[in-house]
Structure formats: C-alpha cells, structure tokens
C-alpha cells in the first residue's frame, strides 16, 4: 500500500494555471470550472472551496488517483506557494487531501487569514 504521496496544488487563475499552460484544459473549461465553484486542483482533480468535487464533471476525464484515495494515504505532502493559490490550498486542506504543506511564509499567512475570515462569517 502507498504510505507517502507528494503532490502540488494548482489554482484556477488564468495566469497561474499549469493545466491551462500545458493545454490540458481550455479557457472555456476554466470558465466552466469557476462557474461550478471550483477553486483549485490536486492530483489532477478539481475541487471547490470546501474541498468537494461533486458536480465537477471535468474530473471524469482524469485517469489517476481519486481524491478519496488520497485521503487514505498516511502522509500526503503538498507543495504550493503564491497568493493566487491560497483559495486552492485552503480548499485542499478542508477536503483533507494533505497533511503536510510545504509553502512560504507569505502564502501561509494568507491561508490563515482567509481561513479566519471564513470562520468569522459563519
């Protein structure tokens, strides 16, 4: 069984999306994903701000690990940095897709700020 996984976390920012740059999705796909509430991706799977994937049909085109399977791996390290990735990182954390995050100080503070704003609004 898999004991360790290392993944990245991608944003849906047009200028920062590695999926868009690589031609794996189009600008139209990006617009559809945003319309469905998606904020980011990890392991090639897109998710919303709470980490949910329900209703995001583009995920059916992916051949690879399911996010539910990623949750069962004892140690999942995600590497991500940059302010455009903050909503995606927080969504991945809320989804339980990682338990170790490698990032920089500025990104970490922005994640904590966004998380505390969400708590205050509820």
Regions inferred by a protein language model and the residue ranges of each:
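Conserved phosphate- and dinucleotide-binding cores of soluble alpha/beta proteins
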Residues: 1-122
């Amino acid at each position: 069984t898999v004991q360790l996984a290392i993944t990245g976390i991608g944003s849906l920012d047009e200028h920062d999306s590695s999926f868009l740059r690589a031609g794996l999705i189009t600008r139209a796909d990006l617009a559809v994903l945003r319309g469905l509430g998606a904020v980011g991706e990890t392991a090639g799977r897109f998710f919303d701000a709470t980490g949910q994937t329900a209703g995001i049909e583009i995920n059916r085109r992916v051949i690879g690990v399911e996010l539910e399977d990623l949750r069962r791996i004892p140690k999942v390290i995600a590497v991500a940095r940059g302010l455009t990735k903050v909503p995606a990182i927080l969504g991945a954390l809320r989804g339980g897709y990682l338990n170790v995050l490698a990032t920089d100080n500025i990104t970490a503070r922005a994640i904590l700020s966004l998380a505390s704003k969400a708590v205050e609004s509820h």
